[in-house]
Amino acid sequence: MIDNIIDYLYERGSIAQITDRKKLNAVLNSQPITLYCGFDPTADSLHIGHLAPLLCLKRFQKAGHRPLILLGGATGLIGDPSFKDSERKLQSFNTTQKWIKKIKLQIALFIDCNSNNASQAHIIDNYSWFSSMNILTFLRDIGKFFSINKMINKDIIKKRLKNDNYGISYTEFSYNLMQSYDFAHIYKHYDAILQIGGSDQWGNIISGIDLIKRMYKKNAYGLTVPLLTNFNNIKFGKTEKNTIWLDPEKTSPYQFYQYWINIDDKSAYHFLKIFTDISVQDINSFKNRDHSYSQAQYILAENMTQLVHGKRGLNIAQRISQNLFSYNILKLTLNDFHQLIQDGIPNIILETNTSLQEALTKSKLATSRSQARYFIKSNAITINAHKQSKIEYIFQDSDRIYNLYTLLKRGKKNYCLIQWNI
């Protein structure tokens, strides 16, 4: 049991913003509460950007509070404009409902929805109340509480209004009202007094708190977790490239494991605090001893892969990594190669007599022929663990292991297994 959940989350770097910390702390320490976090079905899987709020909910549940998970069957049809440069592609109702079914299964991996006690989590869908609300009710009973002056002064709205190519549609403009009403509805019908979300949701959360104050004359609270960003400080999202999904069919356990292995040193310890249950004292102690930071990524990768893909997924990822990074490729059996493909190693099917440049571009180890030539010339390319620096190299029969496979590598950590179409 976590004694003081707010202090605990602050210690682990899991809070970006919070409303009225002192009052919220007092409420949390006096009684169990109901809180919620919303996830819009904008894809058929959650991604690693969703892990921080999910694990925050899990920690509140461990502290004895009841989490609700709101899936945006309605808001997902509209699209959140927060920190998006252009309007999202609108999805059909049938598509979003299919995605919701898959996302429910993923959420159940992290949050206890079956304990049958006071802190048991529940999953709800805002389509259940928005689908029965007519436009007059929405405009008269909700819209009257919102000032256009305040709405257009929000950073994201101002940014989109200045964009001559995209601007913002009334559809997306109304998203803030819908998410705000979600909080008011859940407050009234489920007694939820706290909403959590990513820090990009701060404005929407504050609007919901204000709406509850106006409609019911009651206090509610908000808390945001830090956004997970990549090396260039860009938020991970479904429309960004290189998204790391929680679905093993979209991002294999091996690829998932390698993502955490390859993060920058500074982020490794930060994520150990946010995503694992290793004590902060142990993390700091280890950090002080490990000046090279070499082990933090491996500890993080093991914990995260087991959390999302289980022990079996972790074993698969570690086995592939061990074989590839120890240069044991020539010692693998034919069955091992079959298993590597099943385990999710990046692979591609090519015709014989393919050039090295073509293989590099088709395998996405290079983005263009010119970049492929640069990598070859820089001595960054190996074929079956042997360096290859001939720019016009054509694959030979001797490059095919079991006459079927070739391991192409760029640098130390980027691989693709070629399957030859014989």
From Swiss-Prot:
UniProt: L-tyrosine binding residues: Y36, Y175, Q179
Motif 'HIGH' region boundaries: 41-50
Subcellular location: Cytoplasm
CDD domains for this protein: S4, TyrRS_core
GO MF assignments: ATP binding; RNA binding; tyrosine-tRNA ligase activity
Annotated S4 RNA-binding domain residues: 354-411
Keyword Protein biosynthesis recorded: yes
Keyword tags: Aminoacyl-tRNA synthetase, ATP-binding, Cytoplasm, Ligase, Nucleotide-binding, Protein biosynthesis, RNA-binding
This enzyme's EC code(s): 6.1.1.1
GO biological process, one term: tyrosyl-tRNA aminoacylation
Annotated Gene Ontology cellular component terms: cytosol
Short name of one Pfam family: tRNA-synt_1b
Residues at which ATP binds: K238
Main localization (coarse): cytoplasm
Chain location of the short sequence motif 'KMSKS' region per the record: 235-239
Reaction equations catalysed: tRNA(Tyr) + L-tyrosine + ATP = L-tyrosyl-tRNA(Tyr) + AMP + diphosphate + H(+)
Keyword match RNA-binding: yes
Family: Belongs to the class-I aminoacyl-tRNA synthetase family. TyrS type 1 subfamily.
Its biological purpose: Catalyzes the attachment of tyrosine to tRNA(Tyr) in a two-step reaction: tyrosine is first activated by ATP to form Tyr-AMP and then transferred to the acceptor end of tRNA(Tyr).
Description of how the protein assembles with itself and partners: Homodimer.
Protein name: Tyrosine--tRNA ligase
